[in-house]
Amino acid sequence: MNPFHQRHFLRLLDFSSAEIHALLKLAAELKSTKKSGTEKALLTGKNIVLIFEKDSTRTRCSFEVAAYDQGANITYLGPSGNQIGHKESIKDTARILGRMYDGIQYRGYAQTIVESLAKYAGVPVWNGLTDEFHPTQLLADLLTIQEHQPEKPLSEIKFAYLGDARNNMGNTMLEAAALTGMDVRLIAPEKYWPNAALVTECQKLAEKTGGKITLTENITEGVKNTDFLYTDVWVSMGEPKDVWQQRVHLLKPYQVNMDVVSMTGNPQVKFLHCLPAFHDEETALGKQLAAEFNMYGGLEVTNEVFESEHSIVFDQGENRLHTIKAVMVATLANDLKI
C-alpha cells in the first residue's frame, strides 16, 4: 500500500516523522537506480503542470528532469504564461487544471495560494516554494545530510543556520527539526527570527521527537560543535534599496566565513546553501551588492568557504532532483510499495 498516493506536498508538518524518513529512503533508492541505469518509469502517461510565478533554475530543472526520467509529460507556465489571480481566480484555475493534469507544482508567493490550488484541484499539488515554506528544499537538505553523515541518524545531527531566519527557509527548518529530532540552531538578530506561533508549534512537536530548537543572536554559542552550517541570500532582486541597507547592516556579522567555520570546533563541518549564492562578484547583482556594501569576496558566505572542502552545495543542489522525484512518484504512482 502507498500511503502517499494522491496526497499533496505543501509543508513538512503535513507528514509524520516516519513518512519524511520514507520519502528520504525512496529518494535515495531513485537516485541509486538513476546512477546505475536501472531506473523504472512509474509515471508513464502522467501529465504534470509546473506553475512558476517566480523564476527558478534548480526547482524547474528538477521537476522537468524528474518527470522525463519517470515517463511523465510536463507543461511549464512561467510568470507571464498564466492568468492565476489576474484574469482567473485560483479556485477556477485549480478546477480546470485538475481536469487536465495528474499533478500540479506551484512556485510563487503566499502559502494560501498553493493551499487553494490543493483544495480545489482534485489532484496532488506540490509546493515548489512559497513565501512561507520551501519543503522540497528541506527534503533535499535532509538527504544530503544523511549522505554526508551516514553513521549518524538525523536525530543526532547538530545544524546551525545563520542569517535571515524569518524567511521560508527558517520556517521550514523549524518543521524539519521538529519532525526528525535534529538539534537546529537559528542564529540571527532577534528581528529576523521566525514567527513566534510557528516556533511554539514546532517546539511542542520537537519535545515528542527529541528535537531541539534554539533561537539565538550569539554566533559563538550557536555554531559550537555543529555538523552543518547553512545560510541563504540576504537580499532579492526587486526589493527596495533601503531594505538592502538595513538588512545587510544587521546581518553582516552573521556572514559564514572561515572564522565561523573555526568556531564550530569541528574540522569536518560541512557547509550548505540552497542557492543561488552571492559568494563572489561574477553576477550583475553580486557585483552591485559588493560595491554597495564594500563586501568583496562574498555577502552571506565568503567565496573561501563556498569553494572549500567544507562546501557540499552542489551535492545538495543535485539532490533537489532526487527528492522532488520521490515526491512525484510517491503521490502519483498507484502501485508503489513504501
Curated annotation (Swiss-Prot):
Pathway: Amino-acid biosynthesis; L-arginine biosynthesis; L-arginine from L-ornithine and carbamoyl phosphate: step 1/3. InterPro entries: Asp/Orn_carbamoyltranf_P-bd, Asp/Orn_carbamoylTrfase, Asp/Orn_carbamoylTrfase_sf, Asp_carbamoyltransf_Asp/Orn-bd, Orn/put_carbamltrans, OTCase_ArgI. Carbamoyl phosphate binds at S56, T57, R58, T59, Q83, R107, H134, P135, T136, Q137, C274, L275, R320. Its EC number is 2.1.3.3. It holds the Pfam family OTCace. It is an enzyme of class 2 (transferase). GO terms for molecular function: amino acid binding; ornithine carbamoyltransferase activity. L-ornithine binds at N168, D232, S236, M237. It is found in: Cytoplasm. Transmembrane segments: none annotated. GO terms for biological process: arginine biosynthetic process via ornithine; citrulline biosynthetic process; L-arginine biosynthetic process. GO terms for cellular component: cytoplasm. It catalyses: carbamoyl phosphate + L-ornithine = L-citrulline + phosphate + H(+). Keywords: Amino-acid biosynthesis, Arginine biosynthesis, Cytoplasm, Transferase. Its main location: cytoplasm. Belongs to the aspartate/ornithine carbamoyltransferase superfamily. OTCase family. Reversibly catalyzes the transfer of the carbamoyl group from carbamoyl phosphate (CP) to the N(epsilon) atom of ornithine (ORN) to produce L-citrulline. This is Ornithine carbamoyltransferase. It comes from Photorhabdus laumondii subsp. laumondii (strain DSM 15139 / CIP 105565 / TT01) (Photorhabdus luminescens subsp. laumondii).
